């Protein structure tokens, strides 16, 4: 759930019998591709990683931490943090042979203070953070050149050329309302081709706006992007 375990990128085989390799094999056997969601830049306070390394979260000494979606930003400006997270993810991906990875980011970067830098160098943290993201993504695409990799602008507003160097598509916005998406995708198209815009047909009424929009409209808007479905297909008619 949203409250725990971000930072602990290990498979719970009590929930998934045979682990991800068995699940991926079953999915592939159906003629489908297998994808995984990850959020490598974040950490939950209720996680083994935070209990072991509380200093690995960005937080300003003497100030209350700002939590968003019950999570904090990992201090990925530190090499040991980057390596720990990516090694966990590599272990999972090596085992399951995933075809697709969604690199999510559900909150902006704040509590900006790194325990690894002196006070007079804290102004470097934002820049170092972005360079760290690029380094982590570089390691991912170098290791898995055939992987379809999608990054996210939802929390961090990071729809930009630097991210597209590593991921050919970016989740355009967490707002999936088709009417709102008309403006979002139209505006994005001034800077980027529609092939880069993550766009899905979502549930109705929409989660964010509560709006009811015809299925055809939602499909047309999503097709002006990468096109996908973000709903329970088992509840749909043929």
Language-model regions: role of each:
Residues 34-38, 101-103, 150-151, 229:
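Hydrophobic faces of well-ordered beta-strands that scaffold small-molecule active sites
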Residues 17-32, 125-144:
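Alpha-helix-loop-beta-strand connector modules within alpha/beta enzyme cores
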Residues 1-84, 100:
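Aromatic-lined carbohydrate-binding/catalytic grooves of carbohydrate-active enzymes
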Residues 66-97, 165, 198-203, 219, ...:
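Alpha-amylase-like alpha-glycosidases and glucanotransferases acting on alpha-linked glucans and related
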Residues 133-238:
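Active-site-proximal substrate-binding groove within the catalytic cores of carbohydrate-active enzymes
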Residues 1, 84-118:
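Active-site groove signature of glycoside hydrolases
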Residues 39-43, 106-108, 152-156:
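Active-site beta-loop-alpha junctions enriched in small/polar residues
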Residues 27, 85, 104, 149, ...:
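Conserved, mostly hydrophobic/aromatic
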